[in-house]
Regions:
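Conserved alpha/beta-domain cores
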Residues: 1-157
Length: 157
């Protein structure tokens, strides 16, 4: 699969898809076989969140970059330690955006995954699963902890 970062418009996705089609035509002209490749986007800007319904019609999957999305939504420099106390990835606006993305993605037939620090935040694992996320992308050091959290949940309730 191919994932495109920092998307802010449907136009950008359409332009990228045109380039991919041009490359496919070049390969066909050279009789080079290739398989179909899923194309997706990183949702990491508030603009992409707000048009996620339209974007879902153009791609096969979404991966949410929660670190950048939080930074850009809250207008906070996460590299500035003086602002650590207001960098809140649990902010209600972030959680509402995450729900909007997964709902719009699924309505458009997209697989939706979450990555970044929030993917490994076990205080939100149940929330993400109940929202309908298809995948939580976590660092190798967090796999066991997240797996244990998932196994401890009663997801059928």
């Amino acid at each position: 699969s191919i994932m495109y970062p920092m998307i802010t418009s449907v136009w950008e996705v359409k332009q990228i898809k045109k380039i991919v089609e041009e490359v496919k035509e070049e390969l066909r002209a050279q009789n080079i076989e290739f398989g179909e490749v899923a194309q997706g986007i990183m949702i990491e800007t508030p603009a992409a969140v707000m048009i996620s319904r339209e974007l879902a019609k153009e791609v096969d999957f979404f991966s949410i970059g929660t670190n950048d999305l939080t930074q850009y939504t809250l207008a906070i420099d996460r590299q500035n330690p003086k602002l650590d106390n207001i960098y809140d990835s649990h902010h209600p606006a972030i959680l509402k955006m995450l729900k909007m993305i997964v709902d719009n993605g699924h309505k458009g037939g997209c697989w939706v995954g979450i990555c970044g620090e929030l993917g490994a935040d076990t205080t939100l694992t149940e929330t993400f699963l109940s929202m309908g996320y298809d995948e939580l992308s976590v660092s190798p050091s967090m796999i066991l902890k997240v797996r244990q959290e998932i196994r401890s949940l009663d997801l059928k309730a």
